[in-house]
């Protein structure tokens, strides 16, 4: 039987590295880089990325685990038992059966992980070859525990990509944006260049702003807000999110995965007994009414939107979409722009599909 030990690369636990004699575990809290609104311990992954010596794989993985992913579940396992190789698997214990029943969003997150992994390896002039789904694509209905990808070090050298420098700066920004600030004229072109490889594989980028099409932008704002409400008022999907909330700095540090609510504001609410999971399950509670108002303001204050579409919904296309999204987000960061993924309208649970199948096809 394989012996399993825990070695903390960063703070917490969410990427399992399988080695001949031990397992190594590390986690991205989903919190932004160090700042006054989050506990310092929760930012360890950003502060410690790339700090380990020795194996290039663990160094590259320390950046890959900062990848954006649904509900910050970080559903990845990296098997390092073969020298100079990473066998990348999906952790089937980390699933979102209510909001992501087919595992599409989680697989997109795995694509983000692979893109950051390659950027980090290339930064050290190490080229890698990535073979996806070596055992074949999983069912369109459910992911399995077969390898998502085999990553091998190549004999050639690689050139560093400027987007690597944005990995530690990128974050999903969940605050209202500045609607008065126009989208820089060069942005659509820069984002398209960032996902040039993905475009060759059938993916397309769309960008809309107040300058380019106010009607389409307004339609997308309404669509994202209405979809957020569907997920919120559907009891089982909202409960899935509430169960994954880490309320207060103590929970964020103890379990640095899931949806982080760690800041002095939430610490005070928790200490005063004004916020807890039971209360958050009541969608009509005063606190949740405030949350609705906050998210409506956030989504309606969106000066531009970007989307990625594929010619198929294959598992390979989903994985490549994640790689494209990671690059687009890093390219936006390089221009001083912030992004937040709002993909509720694409979720496959019945209530969402019934409400949005027609509308989302006509909008985009």
Q: What is each of the regions a protein language model found here?
A:
Residues 2-364:
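Acidic, surface-exposed loops and disordered segments
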